[in-house]
Amino acid sequence: MGKLDVIQAKGTERLKRGFAKMVKGGVIMDVTNAEQARIAEEAGAVSVMALHRVPADIRKAGGVARMAPIEKIQEIMDAVTIPVMAKVRIGHVAEAKILEALGVDMIDESEVLTPSDPFFHIDKREFTVPFVCGARNLGEAVRRIWEGAAMIRTKGEAGTGNIVEAVRHVRLVAEGIRQIQAMTDDQVYAVAEKFAEPYLRLSLNVKEIAGLPQRVLDNEPIYGHYTYREIVDGLYKILLEIKKLGRLPVVNFAAGGVATPADAALMMQMGMDGVFVGSGIFKSSNPPKMAKAIVEAVNHWDEPDVLVEISKEIGEPMRGQDIEELEVRLEERGV
């Protein structure tokens, strides 16, 4: 491939998904400074996520959680040789443009930060940098993929050290895929129509305020320049690909609540392509040992005897939270 071809290929769906595949089978760790980034790299992380605070501290601090300071992200980028990701608020196109210009390797449009748009996620096809997005179920995953996400992750419930919501989301997506595979193409199209409904909310809201009929025409733009029927057809195409593959067509990581090597191994046993670890590393009593143990657990997830040794002398994991006691459920953000 010549230089011109490389330039023309930049930002294509194939290139974006190719980057995501490079981190497949690995661990991506949240870090808040250069020292933590170096600990993650030395432990074997395939990438780091640059944040101002880890999710547990974001949850504790309250208020509005935004993109990390540029100086902080740059400090982390300068400290390591592995890819650096950073988070933006759901729907915040300007934050994403800034991170793209800064040169991060991937952007996470994340429910961990305070959403900026109550109606839509970013149209990720408008960017050259690849995106990862969270999903609780097949509908959310397919919508994010149609919008251009190169990687999907479970939302879980970030900052809790509780794996239960990540398990829930893995099972919901897997069962959705199983049911799609049993459907006729006409039934799959009906599912695509159902999955497209969240894009109608803004248009229907405005019509309701104006006293107009609660109806959207097939040729009426409802998400950027995309019409309802174009969105349905796009979702249908992705669902047919899922039906054929028996899995999502992009890399699918676990995230939200991973706090121990056993949690990481469980996610891999459930069919995940890799693991994000947020608060679980640097809220543990021995971050370097916990980081290395979680990386090794992902590498040896199907070897119980090895997992026994990995789980020894790693210190105390982060203190977990009961999901039912939470005042704010981050996983419910987004559509």
Curated annotation (Swiss-Prot):
Entries under InterPro entries matching the protein: Aldolase_TIM, PdxS/SNZ, PdxS/SNZ_N, RibuloseP-bd_barrel, Thiazole_synthase_ThiG
Sites where the protein binds D-glyceraldehyde 3-phosphate: 171
Keyword Lyase: yes
PROSITE patterns in alphabetical order: PDXS_SNZ_1 (PS01235), PDXS_SNZ_2 (PS51129)
Keyword Ligase appears in the UniProt entry: no
Family: Belongs to the PdxS/SNZ family.
Name of this protein: Pyridoxal 5'-phosphate synthase subunit PdxS
Gene: pdxS
